[in-house]
């Protein structure tokens, strides 16, 4: 391993300047005042199985991507293509782990690059014609005065045929490169020209593929470093990326360059929630059903809901009972009022009857009532003073000495019975006759006089 690393390092000493083909910056804080860098401020695993992962968190800076079972596909389909993405966020020290499979093809370079605005850089690079090794490299502030930084390390298996996890773990004290679970390289701060060339400012994450063996865009040295000229009749050449787990070791919303030194101590962390972190939270929060929302509520909240629901039911029951009892009370009051009205009407009728009785009006006779009691009521006295004695009480009948008349001569006539053939009146010794007839009269002229 040491032999291979040293041999490849010797070659890289000459060729490494051309490795920077995909590195660039839009504003260099060492030379001008630049906008603050938007922070990631958290950790997240970006799974490249849909375009939304790229569009939400990355910019496609060259070419285009497709997506399949093996993740995002960075494909060179013809000469001059170099599909590349760059994160919309920065990390200020952190860890980046990419699960990927490098592209095949002589001269084709697959890369994982961390790059800052002042051209601090940490690299993983894979050459399509090399199926045994991967290159590690770094730069500080774009310094290319020496080319002794790249070191190649063997991979557990062919990096163009198998997926591996390639990791960069970066702090203010050192940089580590890992393949799967094996640490292959460590760069200490002091080992980079006492920190002057040590990568130490906020960085974006860049993933891409390009043709170092394209003679139209590269020098002969770059072509040799890439393993030779690319044969574009053998396209497509594809790098596959399943995921990138990124952790920002700083927390904040932005990173501010306070001077032009490029020293990590001059970077100010602006507090707050980053835009990217808020987007992650929004996108990763699942839409829950009502049942799931209920299941996720704390027990105290559920208890409060139960109590509130019970109170609501109790209130409804109370309202129902109140309405029922009030209506029942109203019905009882109405019934009592009706009964009082009927009782009053009866009392008024009785009062009127008694007034008529006292006045002897309407057939009432106080003298008759005194001797006969209630039998004097009910119509008996209604004939008094009228001269009417019924159909059998005509003058001719009285003159002919009919039994009815004869009976009437000895006492009052029965209102229902007519005596015939000498039958006796129902009045007997048990029912004494009145001492004075209720009325008397003569057939002469049909007038009635007392006997």
From Swiss-Prot:
User: Which PROSITE patterns does this chain map to?
Assistant: GH16_2
EC number(s) from the headed UniProt entry: 3.2.1.14, 2.4.-.-
Specify whether Hydrolase is a keyword of the entry: yes
The cysteines joined by S-S bonds are: 27-34
Task: Please give one Pfam family short name.
Answer: Glyco_hydro_16
In which residues is chitin bound? Answer: 125, 206, 210, 222
Cytoplasm recorded as keyword: no
For this protein, the record's PANTHER family field holds: GLYCOSIDASE-RELATED, GLYCOSYL HYDROLASE-RELATED
Q: Which residues form the signal peptide?
A: 1-21
Name this polypeptide is given? Crh-like protein 2
Tell me the active site: 121 (nucleophile), 125 (proton donor)
Its main subcellular localisation, reduced to a broad class, is membrane
Q: From what organism does this protein derive?
A: Botryotinia fuckeliana (strain B05.10)
Keywords from UniProt, A to Z, are:
Cell wall biogenesis/degradation, Disulfide bond, Glycoprotein, Glycosidase, Glycosyltransferase, Hydrolase, Membrane, Signal, Transferase, Transmembrane, Transmembrane helix
| SUPFAM superfamilies from the UniProt entry | Concanavalin A-like lectins/glucanases (SSF49899)
Q: Name one GO cellular component term.
A: fungal-type cell wall
| Upper taxonomic lineage | Eukaryota, Fungi, Dikarya, Ascomycota, Pezizomycotina
| Source species, domain of life | Eukaryota
Give every GH16 domain span.
22-241
Question: How does the UniProt record describe the way this protein sits in the membrane?
Answer: Single-pass membrane protein
Where does the chain cross the membrane? 305-325
Query: Family, per the entry?
Result: Belongs to the glycosyl hydrolase 16 family. CRH1 subfamily.
What this chain does, per the entry, is described as: Dual chitinase/transglycosylase that plays a role in cell wall architecture. Chitinase and transglycosylase activities are coupled. Required for the polysaccharide cross-linking at the septa and the cell wall. More specifically, transfers chitin to 1,6-beta-glucan in the cell wall.
Q: Provide the assembly information.
A: Forms homodimers as well as heterodimers with other crh protein members crh1 and crh3. Dimerization may be necessary for the transglycosylation activity.
